[in-house]
């Protein structure tokens, strides 16, 4: 799998959403190998999108379409500065509680790990126990970048359920796992709370 993370500052979330809705309507049918996208804008105007493709080749074919270029030329004008693109083939998808497209709340976390391999190993442990402890989590997509950087997308049933889940006392084994994960972070991660997530999949 190949993922492209697009982010930047916007001043009109509704206009950006209309542009992406337009892409789904007009361009998605011709985007062979596109698997789905999660996007949204935080309350302070930070836009982020995570687009998934079957392969890097499929993503490049999409980017090279004239209609894609024309669409992005117009959409880029909605950003208050330059949008950044970060590509990755280091992708782990974990779906435990249904269809991520049904999520009522999405949180994107970006940071840097001192040991990405160990962090990925920890994320894959005790998935059944985590699913039982946090039924509000539908699934996640973990994306590794150069230099230990990462983007993690977590899909929740609702923000209310997510906040309630955060307050629950963890079983000791899961707490130890979380403590080790946090200790691997270099600096403080950035959180993007998408209270109205845009969830797109091929029709």
Where are these regions (language model features)?
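Short S/T/G/P-rich N-terminal loop/turn motif that feeds into the first structured element of a domain
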Residues: 1-48, 52-203
């Amino acid at each position: 799998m190949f993922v492209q993370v697009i982010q930047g500052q916007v001043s009109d979330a509704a206009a950006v959403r209309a542009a992406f809705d337009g892409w789904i309507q007009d361009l998605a049918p011709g985007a062979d190998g596109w698997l789905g996208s999660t996007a949204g804008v935080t309350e302070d105007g930070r836009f982020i999108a995570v687009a998934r493709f079957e392969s890097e080749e499929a993503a490049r074919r999409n980017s090279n379409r004239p209609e894609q270029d024309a669409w992005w030329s117009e959409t880029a004008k909605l950003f208050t500065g330059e949008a950044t693109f970060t590509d990755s083939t280091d992708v782990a998808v974990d779906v435990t509680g249904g269809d991520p497209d049904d999520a009522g709340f999405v949180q994107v976390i970006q940071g840097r790990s001192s040991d990405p391999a160990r962090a990925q190993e920890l994320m894959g442990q005790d998935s059944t126990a985590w699913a039982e402890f946090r039924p509000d989590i539908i699934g996640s997509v973990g994306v590794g970048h150069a230099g230990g950087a990462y983007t993690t997308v977590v899909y929740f049933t609702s923000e209310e359920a997510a906040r309630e889940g955060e307050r629950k006392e963890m079983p000791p084994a899961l707490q130890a796992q979380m403590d080790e994960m946090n200790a691997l972070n270099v600096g403080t991660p950035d959180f993007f709370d998408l209270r109205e997530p845009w969830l797109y999949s091929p029709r």
